[in-house]
């Protein structure tokens, strides 16, 4: 992967196809802008082999906020999605949905409530709560989790 591809893949496209296809479904159904809440949590403390941690430390919030600031669908991201095909060779994302991503998608439309960095956190208790448009929350979910999960693991 060259630098250009890495830059594209680490931006708003740091997600999976499921999140994008669900967002497109919400868009088609006309519910993409209803307010929704997403709770981010982890299920168990790290198991280091020789001992299992009794808690974790929240980390990665600054990185997550930086990532959110850069989460935009520009020309490169739209062209990448425009070239996505189904197994039958049909385009996966419609032009009107791609136009919405380019013109109207904004990670700034969400409210993020988070446990402060450095605080003790526990399994099954929300670390972040995202409130905002359903499709936006769906699209940014994987990127946010990928951004903070490793940092929490090593903190």
Annotate each predicted stretch with a short phrase.
Residues 1-155:
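Ordered alpha/beta subdomains of enzyme catalytic regions
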